[in-house]
Amino acid sequence: MVNTFRILLINGPNLNLLGIREPHIYGYEALSDVVANLYKTSESLGIHMDHFQSNAEHELIECIHKSYKNSDFIIINPAAFTHTSIALRDAFLSVNIAFIEVHLSNIHIREKFRYHSYLSDIALGVICGFGVYGYHCALHMAHKYLSKKINK
């Protein structure tokens, strides 16, 4: 029997404007195109991927809560909520699902208020500064992590 991993991709505030908002920082590709490419990659890896984007913190929290028992792994770009949301952190601690934090830009070379993340210390890993390729890297790492976990 082949296991199909269930990975949830979550994108936070303003990422719906990817390709429009400060493209010199975040890139020129629309979120819909990024997600479409990730769906193709996930299919090639035998992964069932779902995607959710919201500008509202409470909707992201609800999405994380609903992932309990429905997702094996989460990839999240929390965007600005990275630096402000204790509630997102608590949501992850509540469901106990491994996750990778992704940022399109390198948050450590930008404004000082972006240096701190409320999620990094509880994430399996953090990928930042590689644009949309960071999502692909996270997807491959999630697959590798889940494959190792299932083979133990």
From Swiss-Prot:
Broadest EC class assigned to this enzyme: lyase
Chain positions of site Transition state stabilizer: R21
Catalytic reactions of this protein: 3-dehydroquinate = 3-dehydroshikimate + H2O
A matching Pfam family: DHquinase_II
Known EC number: 4.2.1.10
PROSITE patterns per UniProt: DEHYDROQUINASE_II
GO biological process, one term: aromatic amino acid family biosynthetic process
Assigned keywords, A-Z: Amino-acid biosynthesis, Aromatic amino acid biosynthesis, Lyase
Catalytic residues in the record: Y26, H103
GO molecular function, one term: 3-dehydroquinate dehydratase activity
Record-listed substrate binding positions: N77, H83, D90, L104, S105, R114
Pathway stated in the Swiss-Prot or TrEMBL entry: Metabolic intermediate biosynthesis; chorismate biosynthesis; chorismate from D-erythrose 4-phosphate and phosphoenolpyruvate: step 3/7
InterPro entries for the chain: DHquinase_II, DHquinase_II_CS, DHquinase_II_sf
HAMAP family the UniProt entry points to: AroQ
Function text: Catalyzes a trans-dehydration via an enolate intermediate.
Description of how the protein assembles with itself and partners: Homododecamer.
Similarity annotation: Belongs to the type-II 3-dehydroquinase family.
Protein's recorded name: 3-dehydroquinate dehydratase
Source organism of this protein record: Blochmanniella pennsylvanica (strain BPEN)
Lineage of source species: Bacteria, Pseudomonadati, Pseudomonadota, Gammaproteobacteria, Enterobacterales
